[in-house]
Every structure is written in C-alpha cells, then in structure tokens.
Amino acid sequence: MDIKKSLVLIFSAYGCFLSAQEKVIDTVYIFDNQMNKVKLFHSVNTIRPKDFEKNATNLSELLRFQSQLYIKENGRGAVSSPSFRGTSAGHTAFVWNGININSAFLGQGDVNNMPLFGYDELEVKAGGGSVQYGSSAIGGSIHLNNNLEFNKGPHAFLYSEAASFGTFNNFLRSSFSNEKFSVKVSGNYVISQNDYEVPEKEYINRNGRFYNSSINIGASYKIAPHQTISWQNQLFDGSQHYPIFTENGNKTKYKAQTLRSLLSWDITKNDFSNSLKLAYTEDNFQYFGDIDKPKESGAEGKNYIFRNDFNYFITPKLNVNGIGEFQINKGIGYQSGIGDISRNVGSAAGLIRYFVTSDLRFEAGIKKDFVENISSPFLYSFSGKWHPIKWYEVGASFSRNFKFPTFNDLYWRQGGNPDLVPETSTNLDMDHELIFGDLRLTVSPYYMDIKNYINWLPTAAGYWAAFNTYSVEIYGLDSRINYQKDFGNHHFTFNGGYTYSRSTNKVTGMQMMYVPLHKATGNIDYRYRFLSVYVQGLFNGLTYTTTDEKRADAIDPYFVLNTGISAKFLNHYTLGFKVNNITDVVYQTVSYYPLPKRNYSVYININF
C-alpha cells in the first residue's frame, strides 16, 4: 500500500468516527491486554510521558539514560540498535500495542526510526517472552503502548523544543472522549542539521542531518456495556544521512517509511475476556549510495496479522489463557537478490494460572509456532511469585524462547542460507523485591544459554554467508531502586539501575562484542511548587568492539551527566532548559562515532 494513500484513508476514517455522548465514569482502554497478565509474574520498567521530555531527541537517548539496555548508535540520530542483557539486536522484541513489529528483513528494530512521542508510555520487560510475544523475545522486549481514555472531554498538548546543532522538535496531541467514544490524534516533526564536533577525536559529524515525522490516530467506541471496538494507527517517514569522515567523502543516506494499523474487538466480563486483533504493518526503506542519485538498494515488507487472546477464570483461583496468531509476511527486495517472497506464520499458545492465595501464584505456558519451510521449536514458560512477608517479594521464571531466521538470512543473494534453523534460548530469571517504606529495591539475577547463533561469515567463494554457528552463555544481574518522598511542597524522586552482563562465546570464551560488563543509571527529580529540577547520570563500563577482547580497540568507560530545570506558570504553561553532557565528556557507543559533547536545549509545553 502506498504510504501517502494510506494517510488519506486514515484521515477519512477518522472523520467518520466523530460523535458525542454523555459522561458517566472514567476508564482507560489499553491495546496490549496481555501485559497486565505479564506484570503479575515479572518486573516491568514503565517510562511515562513526563519522562520523555528529559531525553526528547530520540528513543535511543531515552532508553540509554532511563533503562538497563545498551544502545549502539552510529552517531547521534543514525542507525541504532539495542543490546539487552548481553544479547544481540535481534534478541530484543519490539512490541507495538501487543503486536511484534521486528523487521522481517533484519529481525530487529531500528530504535531511531520509532517516533518517541508516538506512544503514551514505554514498558521495558527483561527476560524471555516468546510464549506471549513471539520471535526475538530472548533478552527482553520493549513495549510501545498507546491508550485511550474515556469520559475526559477535550484536551490538547503542545511540546516545542529548540536545541543545539540546529535541532527542532515539535509535537502536538489532541484528544476528546465521553462515556462511549474516545479519539486521540497526534503529530511529531523532528529535524536536525546534527553538525556537532568532537575536537579531541578530530571528529566532525559531517553529513549527519536527520529528520522524521509521524502521525498517530487512535479511536475507541463502546458498542455495548462489555464490548469495545478500537483502532490505532501510526504513519512514520524518516531520513538519516550517514556521517562521513572526510570533507570530500561520498555522502550517503537512508530513508524509511512505516505504516501500522490495528483494529481490536474486546469483550470483557467478570469471568472471561476476549481480544481479537487484526493488524496491517508496512515497512519500506531505501539506501542511497549518493544522496543526489537514485536509490541503490531497498526493500518493502508487508505483514497481515490476525491474533486472538482468550482469557477465562474456571474458578476464582484458576485461570486459563489461549493465544492464537496467524501472519502472512510478504517482502520484495531491490538490488539484494531477494525476489517477491511470502511466508505464512502461525502459532498456538496456552497458559494456565493458579492463584493459591493473594500472596502466592503460579503460571505455566506452552507454545508451538508453525513457520513455513522452517522447523520451529516447542516453547514453554514456568513462572511463580510469592509475597511471604510485607517487605519482601520473590519471583522466578524458567522459559524456552526463540528467534527464527530473517528474510535477509534466508534469501539474500549471495549469502542467504535456506537451511538455517531458529536460534533458541533457555532462560532462568529471578526477581527479589524489597520494600521499606518509600524505598523499593529490585534485584534480578539471570541466566541464558543461546544456541544456533546466526552469523554472517566469509566464504571461500569470496562472499559472506549466513550460518548457524556457536552458542552463547550469558549470566548477570539487573537491579533497580526507586525512592519517593514528599515534604509539604517539596517532592523528591530517585530512580536508579545497575546491570552486570557477562556474555561469552562458548567456543572462544571471549566476551561478546558491544556488551558492557557494567552499566548504571540514575535519575533524580525535585519539585517545589512551580519549579522542577532533574539530574541524570549514566555510567558505562569497558565495552569490547572485537571478538578477541582487544583492549586497544575497546570503548573506554565513561560517565555522562545531564540536567534540566523547568517552571510551570498560569497552570497551563511550562518553560524548561536542559544541559546534556554537563562535564563535556568524550564518549561513544560504537567505534569511530563519538556522540555530542556539552549541548543545550530550551522547550515549552502547553496543556489546554
């Protein structure tokens, strides 16, 4: 489907939804209904819109400073991918409103081509999750959620920011809801010349310009007391110029367009619920070897997704949950040797939950995927949570997860390998949560064993090809701490996290590339009446960039500090000022691509 035509269809349908009803009670519709069940057994880090503004440039910056992920960014705003608990980019599932949206070509998501302000909240779940969320949910999953509120009337919000390096970020959202109907429309536009310099590295971010725009539309209508029809759409268009190292270097760029549309019919009663979802997603991208010439390569992917999630309480203590999904994945490549291809993917999952008491519960799940021309493994998960005493809660999970080969892995010419088998992992996760008054501490040790790692290796014929290769053993520790305290008009919040990841190639015994052994984050917020101040800190430990742990090529440890101050006036207006990298540290997340030194921004937001 042509993206511009899709935009016309979206706005036309949006106009048909408008209506008016009487007010009754406040409710919120959340598209990803499975996440509420996941939270019964697993620790989830939720990042809300008020925290988006601290790291508003892109999703990479937000996740870097406010989650346990390591984000590999080839220069500010350029290609970016996550490493979750020592895994590779393809072992993190991106889930949009309950739908897995990892690229069929790459098997991963480009973090900087996901519009930060396109979502109402982000949730970061560590550990295996393939039974609920499918392929790639090995290291963890990132949930990009939208919600629709009822009975709130009209509301609008504007965020506008001007920042260093010719960066401008504008976001507008408008919503209306009553008893039966809710609609929300938003748009975001970001542009940056991105021409920063790092003299210590003799680096200028030449040809670093980027821009992107997105439109989001959501609507929900209560067709009966226990039934809701909901619709969510996202349209994204972006362009990233790839940095060059010399003044006369060849300037290249990458363009991406994304369309996501989801229709959901939900029935919710006392003892059962059912959510039927129909989704269409489209991902187009083009690579330009010369920014002034036609594209050199590219691809177009289309996915048709049907998913049903049925949940039933047999007794107040015993709950069964069945999830069925069918997808048609279509793709066509340009100058990649990938022809017009299609793949059918089906899955059936069953989960049973037993609530022994209000403080003790268990869950067991099984799943079988049916991927055309690929033999898929049998998956399972076993979880439990116990709250034995007031200040302590413990949870544990044992699961098998997988990632099936991508279109590029299978069909790229030359080098694609149709004989590849899925990667599989065995995961063991634990959560120890301690609560002392206003202090909450979560400590989560974990273990993973990943087999049949898919890698591209040189061949005797002179080209690179995809193979199932070695196994990887990963163990480590995640921890999070939260403290909140109010003293009259003084409000204080601290959120911190520490991650240790030992990720070892079982053949060589060496640490995997771009997996820091240590990472720590801290966010302090203080508010007094109309005035707010925050400070962010990020420590990243030694990070190897080669397979042989060569120290000379490794990224040295670094500590980055950000701060910001804002003032709210006349109840509706907030004016803020931010300083990023206060101490002017030279740092990078990918070799040869330093990130900006000290930089500034000023912003205003208006609620009306």
Question: Predicted segment positions?
Answer:
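N-terminal periplasmic "start-of-domain" segments of outer-membrane beta-barrel proteins
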Residues: 26-53, 81
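Extracytoplasmic beta-strand/coil segments of soluble accessory domains associated
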Residues: 60-99
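Short acidic/polar hinge/loop motifs at secondary-structure boundaries
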Residues: 71, 99-127
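Short strand-turn segments of transmembrane beta-barrel domains in outer membranes
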Residues: 128-131, 141, 146-176, 187, ...
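Flexible loop and strand-edge segments within Gram-negative outer membrane beta-barrel domains
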Residues: 192-198, 202-214, 222-303
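Outer-membrane beta-barrel signature, preferentially recognizing the C-terminal barrel domain
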Residues: 247-268, 387, 391-393, 397-451, ...
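Gram-negative outer-membrane beta-barrel transporters
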Residues: 357, 447-449, 468-545, 571, ...
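C-terminal beta-signal and adjacent terminal beta-strands/loops
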Residues: 450-451, 539-546, 565-608
